[in-house]
Amino acid sequence: MHHLSIDLETYSSVPIAKAGAQKYISSPDFEILLFAYSVDGAPVEIIDLARGEHLPPWLVQAITSPEYIKHAYNAPFEWGCLSKFLGTLPPDQWRCTMFHGLYCGYTAGLDATGKALGLAEDKRKLNTGKALIRYFCVPCAPTKANGGRTRNLPQHDTDKWELFKEYCRQDVVTEMEIERRLSAFPVPDFVQKQWETDLIINARGVAVDMDLVSGALYLGNVTRQDLTQEAMKISKLDNPNSVAQLTQWLQEAMGEELADLRKDTVARLLGKEDNSPQVQRMLEIRQELGKTSTKKYDAIEAAVCPDGRVRGLLQFYGANRTGRWAGRLVQVQNLPRTYTEPLPLARELVEHRKLDALRLIYGSVPDTLSQLIRTAFVAPEGHVLIDADFSAIEARVISWLAGEQWRLEVFRTHGKIYEASASQMFGVPIELIKKGNPEYALRQKGKVAELALGYQGSTGALINMGALDMGIPEEDLPDIVSRWREANKRIRDLWYSMDNAAVQVITQGGSVGVNGLLLAREYDYNQGTDCFTILLPSGRKLYYVSPGIGENQWGNPSISYMGMDQKTKRWKRIETYGGKLVENCVQAIARDCLADTIERLEAAGLPVIFHIHDEVVIDIAPWADEDTMLDTVVNIMRQPIPWAADLPLNADGWVGTFFKKD
């Protein structure tokens, strides 16, 4: 078996960041400028396609041959580029070094990963690349100085072109060095297969209703203009969208100081009974304008390919620590819920730009448009969407992992975990916790406890989950925490067992088993790589780079590792603890359940077009009635997972022509 490492530099007039790689590649003016490669670690060669050089026949054959494993950093891009010219290349011949780095706990980005691994200067990515990419890879503005051209070619600056070739060559050097450094921690074959399936799903894409999208963009713009004009008329402000101007106006009109105009502040002010009609309406307009964003519709419009499908919505292994997928472009993992009825009529009114009718029937136009974003994803003519999602997957997984038997029994029977939790916490028969009984009020406490407390959260977690907004007095929160922990002793014990085991393996080395998980300290002495790992029941590992033990604010041992800070986006030392490690494992196991299920669905000829944590969406020509089709999918999702045969899974869903939250 040979190994072919590749890096391409390309040109397209389509902006890749907004439109995604598939639309970028599908542009008629797309071309590959440079092709850098190395075979079996030999010195890197470069082919200058932009200046007339050609790939030798043996290299073209190698790209399509199963005798050559192709490596690239962000391999889906190189795979997509070459597939445009050579036909769809077999995904199983490709390996992605960026994914390998993410699997091993590092960050994305060739430069960032090289620095995190401590690569020597001669092995790192050159820092001249961004300016060169801006010069050669994207259109340029026509000026008098450049003769009015809209694109820079090699002959326009030969010195820069030679630098660009060196930059491309060095990217292969860096990619190979990263792969060499990670080779002691290989990606399991079954996870590699999941990456290959993901490549196919992302390339398959999802159809979108562009009449709905364009109608929503039009109505959103008209509504925004109407609201702004009304606000200007009431307030006499030049720009009522200005927070500073509106704050000053409200302070003068209300006679009180305002710290901000955030969503919750506006909602609180709207609840005041002594507001003047003008103040009340200005606050309502402010609230409405906060919902008029059409960014997701803009994102769909920017990313839709010529065939009416959006591709590249998910990044495999995009979520740090857990290995879950991350949303890209339209962010399908963060779409507003749909509760407006009837949805088909709302969609029709938006498609035909019937603003007055939409407002008359549904009230708030911005809120309706926000909900309809989901429904922009559709089945093409002659097809249907089959949507199915796991029921309470994280609650089931943590119960199974901890061995909390009463919870497992709930999931094997009626599944009413909120009622059952309240029953356990307050010693009330579950039969009494139903609508119409005074005991039903306990369900709310059981629900917020279930949502907030599974990963060692306390009163702060309850507040963040909305306990106070539900009307639960703050003084009741400590009691809810203690009751939930007492009712879930095995889950509570799991937090502390994980914390103790992690401290032990980080300080002493070796490995410790906890409830079917194997925690270990792993080294590659040759490369100086040091990781704390957790082997999951599936056989996948979670990696924590350069682990250490410090002291937290309470004087207890504090577990830390190097990772990407989600707020600052910097590679830094991050603290963790037992409950957080449990959360990582539970979400990772839930992710593995989904990944296994996707493989089964694909094998059954049910093509997945995208998925969201615990939910899959299939686009297919109907082969039976709706109930039969849904049962087929749901039964596959309910099948026991081979490595978690006693984990009780359940699923439900719907069949329709557009995406929604049922």
Model regions and ranges:
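Active-site-proximal helix-loop-helix substrate-binding element of RNase H-like nuclease domains
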Residues: 30-37, 41-58, 62-183, 195, ...
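Short amphipathic alpha-helices in soluble, non-transmembrane regions
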Residues: 629-637
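Short active-site loop/helix that positions an aromatic residue
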Residues: 12, 76-87, 104, 248-253, ...
